[in-house]
């Protein structure tokens, strides 16, 4: 039975985002972009399937499912135990866009499920989840970055990782197009939705890549600036 003092320390840690002694700093410091592991593994698996390396694709699939479940569990645990850390990440220009890897990972995993197992129902659920995640994060992240009072300079705040905000909706498009043929009369609305998403993502790419080009061209560039955030 924890003492009153221990409970107070734990409550203060949740409110301030600090890690109390004995707690797992791994969970507290979990980077929002870690879902890139699921995204990357899924891409390699799908590529292997398309070039005829079926054994490689099938081997990577269960591994990727495990990665997804482990990261999802750690993320949920982090939200529950360290909500202040999560909120701080949402308004951090270097870390916030990492949340969009969740969208891309969900969509890529859905494509894996569809192409390797043929389970359209599971792939559809993952597609819907990806859309929900994308909508919530698009409004949540960019609103938080806009209204926060403490902002870095352009040189410090933007990096190549921001392009994952473009990859996220485009991954939804890829899975949506793969699923559209099975929706009968709803296929055309789904394809129209995918077209709109693709065009919107393309416009977002122009905005972001312009800022990245401007930052790399007109500001001092250090080797550390090319490292992951």
Question: How does the language model describe each region?
Answer:
Residues 42-49, 71-75:
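Alpha-helical transmembrane segments of multi-pass membrane proteins
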Residues 139-145:
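Membrane-water interface at the C-terminal end of transmembrane alpha helices
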Residues 59-73, 122-136, 192-205:
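Structural signature of hydrophobic alpha-helical transmembrane segments
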Residues 72, 209-219:
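Predominantly late transmembrane helices and immediately cytosolic-facing juxtamembrane segments
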Residues 68-86:
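Juxtamembrane transmembrane-helix boundary signature
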Residues 1-16:
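Short, intrinsically disordered terminal tails adjacent to the first/last structured region
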Residues 47-58, 113-122, 176-192:
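Helix-coil boundary and interhelical linker segments in multi-pass alpha-helical membrane proteins
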Residues 15-46, 61, 83-111, 127-130, ...:
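Juxtamembrane helix-loop boundaries in multi-pass membrane proteins
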